[in-house]
Regions:
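Surface-exposed beta-strand/loop patches in extracellular or lumenal glycoproteins
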Residues: 148-158, 705-721
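Catalytic cores of secreted or luminal carbohydrate-active enzymes
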Residues: 77, 85-93, 646-693, 697
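Active-site core of glycosidic bond-cleaving carbohydrate-active enzymes
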Residues: 332-339, 344-368, 376-380, 410-432, ...
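Lectin-like carbohydrate-binding module/patch detector with strong preference for beta-trefoil
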Residues: 1-3, 7-8, 795-930
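C-terminal region of N-terminal signal peptides and the immediate post-cleavage residues
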Residues: 5-20
Length: 930
């Protein structure tokens, strides 16, 4: 690393923009929700002809990936076609090739309604998955009313459906038994695809054993509709089930079908914490877009009986037939943690219920597995990799099972903290909602997870609890892993509190209270992880948290286990002190530094530690390293496959919410790590069924509003450190907390009331009013070399393209003057070889420029202190630039060596040099694809 990082101070009030406004008025926080959400619409300037360019539609139990191959292709996906999560089929509508092949094609996914809109060649399309039933609806206008049309649904080699046709409905139905894998359930599962159409003369036919088709003529006005249903299916009458599902929808008025669709999604967004962010370089807008897309995808995939994601993968938007990246019958909790967290902080608690049910409903099976595989111990050792029916896989000695002593040493054999982790999420969701019935339902999972940990760990001669276990997947079978210590310290008091609330398990409460005093201190080690150090080593300021009490044990995976106490276990805060300093050192010297995997949690850890600049830089770096799909989904590495990962999106959503608002330990923190230079208006759900609305403008909070959902006393950290603040009623402005400069203060709140935390010298109510507003996206959005959507003409050229740059400073083209021997300068009125450059993707979110003048790479010479010059034969950091897309369609170049923007100095009269911190006309260039 270039240097050590320290937490940034809280945002200064003096930095607030002179034109600050507030969206708070008359007791409410005003957001133009439809248009703020639509800022993140996914825009198609060209047809998304490849499956890897597919767009997501779904209702939570039926998901689809939609792209333009064969006119229109949609793969149907469900989470309950177990154990393989097999697709019910792919729908194609070849007659839409006229639209997708037209020169004027364009489209966009409206995230606010969940409707895909496309047009071209005089035709239009609207496609959506009904919010209220498991069917895909495709409405078309502008077709030739006299030309025959068709639609088909197909399966592929390896599938054995029963294909049938009756009247206007065709079906593909298949069942199978879960009896092939270790730990199989013996249950019957299956898939059913039902296809019909609205038009004239609709008739279904069986094409072959894996394909059915509907033939029809459009209505007289050139309109037609295709509907494809895919419900839960375990056998029965396919025809009757299909007929009952589709009903009269083929002929129903579009307005009637869309009204329920629009109503459901409008209600969803109205109850979600919306966030709008802006920065001059577009990074904040890009992160906002990823978060909004995440909220859409989560609602479109996580409302079924089985979680729609099981290994960080967006299974419900698979476009690769039945191919799955990971064992589709199993769930990895590690890869769900940021989804669970983001669902809570955005207020979408219902989306976590399928996950919680997976564990609670399987609790008897988990306990049986624990007794069988963990030496007869009581309680629940929840398998980190758990099959949908509650076991850890193959029980054989040496097998790669989870919670399995016979399987140790192995990836998850002695990973014993997953029960504690899922239990903590249950407790946190209770704290956020105050729903006692929810807590009562899932408390057994908490109780049994704690019971197991008590039994698994033994008190040693030092009076402390000890065990040999995995440090998750990073160290196997080591002494006292940090994950175990964190699980004990976080879970035990939560279970005690829950048991007291429910008036139960007094004996367990006593045991857990005793055990809390028996947890060993965090293992410390040196920066090289070569030895165990005592807690007293903290005084030297050169120790870090170790992964376990065996720091030199073999490293198996790339997880920063030493930061688990920070998040998700919530045990080390940003409060000043030796423990916080230890955690900051641990972050700065973490072994796995860089983009790593797409589930990288650096930005979340940085937010918890108050390291605002790291939040921004890590979000950008991880996104540029892993987002490989135009719908915002990522890859575990950086390759395009057959289904994307959603866990990078959820990591962004979690980090943004944590940077804006935190209250995990009962102290409400406002913008504790919000990046400088990013303005934001957002709402975050916190404890007590409460929402907090925050606006940061010009580097300072300008609106802090609490909308209380319960009556209690809230502890609030002063958003303007050292400044006099007060709290007033959000409707009547009556003073609730008088002027104070205290670091933290108590705010008594009443359910249903709102409160403004404001500076005495600059009250929120004195600011001019402006609602949080936005405009629907009209073009693809870019972040360096990654993008959301597809450009039309004038978009970013592909890797290796020949480009030129036209300076806004003077309207001239940039040249590698004197055949490249002189610095780059914008002084040519036409493009020749000296004005042409190869644009080469560097794979890390940056590009390099190779001059045609001399076939050498452009460098920000002398670490950016000297003008740009085409003089080197290999690419290093001096030769890397981030390609920034500006709102007016121009681009800017940000040097990776010094972080400054390239400018056409002196209105273009002087050579190009990277020495500007902000973008103005001199830093803007038109990118010409030669």
């Amino acid at each position: 690393m270039a240097g050590l990082l320290v937490p940034t101070a809280a945002l200064p009030a003096s930095a607030a923009a002179a034109t600050a406004t507030t969206a708070w008025q008359n007791g409410s926080f005003h957001v133009d929700t439809p248009n703020v959400v639509r800022r993140s619409d996914i825009v198609l300037g060209k047809p998304n002809s490849a499956g890897a360019q597919s767009l997501p539609l779904g209702n939570g139990s039926l998901g689809t990936a939609v792209w333009a191959a064969n006119g229109f292709t949609a793969q149907l996906n469900r989470s309950d076609t177990l154990p393989g999560r097999k697709s019910p089929g792919q729908v194609t509508i070849p007659g839409l090739s006229k639209m997708t092949g037209a020169a004027d094609f364009k489209g966009y996914l409206d995230l606010y309604t969940g409707v895909l809109n496309e047009s071209g060649g005089g035709m239009t399309l609207k496609a959506w998955v009904s919010a209220t039933k498991d069917e895909l609806v495709v409405d078309v206008t502008g077709a030739d009313p006299n030309a025959a049309q068709s639609a088909s649904v197909s399966l592929w080699s390896g599938r054995s459906p029963q294909a049938a046709a009756s009247g206007a409905i065709g079906t593909l139905a298949e069942t199978w038994v879960d009896n092939q894998e270790a730990g199989s359930s013996g249950r019957t599962f299956g898939s059913l695809a039902a296809l019909s159409a609205g038009g004239r003369g609709v008739s279904a036919q069986v094409v072959n054993s894996t394909q059915v088709k509907v033939n029809f003529t459009p209505n007289a006005d050139g309109s037609f509709r295709v509907i494809a249903g895919a419900p839960t299916w375990t056998g029965g009458s396919a025809g009757s089930t299909a007929s009952a599902l589709l009903g009269s929808d083929a002929a129903a008025a579009e307005s009637s079908l869309l009204s329920t669709q629009q109503s459901w999604w409008a209600n969803y967004w109205a109850n979600s914490g919306i966030l709008e962010a802006n920065s001059s370089d577009g990074q904040a807008q890009y992160m906002e877009t990823l978060r909004t897309i995440y909220l859409f995808m989560e609602a479109a995939s996580m409302r079924g009986a089985i979680p729609g994601s099981q290994a960080g993968v967006a299974d419900m938007f698979n476009f690769g037939q039945d191919h799955q990246n990971w064992t589709p019958s199993a769930t990895w909790l590690w890869n769900l943690r940021t989804q669970i967290s983001a669902n809570m902080s955005s207020g979408n608690f219902a989306l976590n219920i399928p996950i919680f049910n997976l564990y609670q409903n399987n609790l008897p099976a988990i306990e049986a597995w624990t007794k069988q595989q963990m030496g007869g111990l009581p309680g629940a050792c929840v398998p980190e990799v758990m099959r949908f029916n509650g076991n850890g896989g193959d029980p054989s000695p040496g097998a790669n099972a989870a919670c399995s002593r016979p399987g140790s040493p192995n990836w998850n054999a002695l990973d014993v903290t997953s029960g504690a982790e899922i239990s903590l999420y249950v407790w946190q969701q209770y704290q956020d909602t105050g729903d006692v019935n929810f807590l009562r339902t899932y408390y057994p999972l908490m109780r049994d997870s704690a019971t197991f940990l008590l039994a698994y760990q033994k008190v040693g001669s030092d009076g402390k609890l000890h065990a040999v276990a995995n440090a998750h997947e990073t160290q196997w079978a080591v002494q006292d892993p940090t994950t175990d210590l964190a699980a004990d310290a976080a879970l035990f008091p939560a279970v005690v509190s829950a048991a007291k609330l429910l008036n139960t398990d007094t004996s367990l409460q006593t045991q857990l209270t005793t055990a809390l005093g028996q947890i060993p201190p965090w293992a410390r080690t040196d920066y090289g992880h070569t030895q165990v150090l005592p807690p007293s080593a903290d005084s030297s300021n050169n120790d870090v948290i170790a992964w376990s009490y065996q720091p030199t044990a073999t490293t198996r995976n790339g997880e920063n286990i030493d930061l688990e106490p920070v998040w998700p276990y919530n045990l080390i805060t940003d409060d000043p002190g030796a423990l916080h300093d230890l955690a900051v050192r641990t972050y700065n010297h973490r072994v796995f530094y860089g983009a790593g995997n797409d589930w990288n949690m650096d930005a979340i850890d940085a937010a918890r530690l108050g390291m605002a600049s790291e939040v921004a830089s890590r979000l950008v770096a991880i996104t540029q390293a892993h987002q490989v799909y135009i719908n915002g989904l990522s890859d575990l590495g950086s390759s395009v496959g057959t289904e994307g990962y959603i866990e990078q999106l959820s990591g962004v959503a979690t980090a943004l919410d944590e940077a804006l608002v935190q209250d995990y330990d009962g102290t409400l923190r406002i913008a504790p790590a919000w990046p400088a230079g990013w303005d934001v208006s957002g709402t975050v759900a916190v404890q007590g069924n409460t929402r907090v609305n925050v606006q940061v403008q010009g580097g300072s909070p300008v609106t802090v509003a609490i909308q209380a959902g319960s009556s209690r006393t809230m502890k609030v950290r002063n958003p303007w450190p050292g400044k006099a603040v007060q709290v007033v009623n959000g409707s009547g402005n009556a003073v609730v907390v008088s002027s104070t400069t205290a670091t933290t203060f108590d705010v008594p709140v009443v359910s249903g009331q709102s409160y403004l935390v404001e500076q005495v010298a600059a009250p929120t109510t004195a600011l001019p009013y402006a609602q949080v507003s936005g405009s629907p996206a009209t073009t693809a959005r870019h972040l360096g070399t990654v993008q959301i959507g597809i450009d039309g003409s004038g978009g970013t050229p592909g890797n290796g393209s020949v480009v030129s740059f036209k300076a806004h400073a003077n309207g001239d083209y940039v040249t590698a003057d004197n055949a490249g021997a002189a610095p780059l300068i914008a002084n040519r009125t036409a493009i020749g070889p000296w004005e042409q450059f190869d644009l080469i993707d560097q794979g890390n979110g940056s590009v390099a420029l190779r001059a045609h003048a001399n076939d050498k790479y452009v460098t920000a010479d002398n670490a950016g202190a000297d003008p740009l010059l085409a003089k080197v034969t290999a690419v290093g950091t001096w030769e890397q630039f981030q390609l920034v897309h500006n709102g007016d369609g121009s681009v800017s170049l940000k040097s990776m060596i010094n972080g400054d923007y390239v400018t056409a100095e002196n209105a273009g009269a002087d050579p190009l040099i990277a020495n500007r911190t902000t973008i103005g006309p001199w830093e803007e260039f038109d990118l010409i694809d030669d």
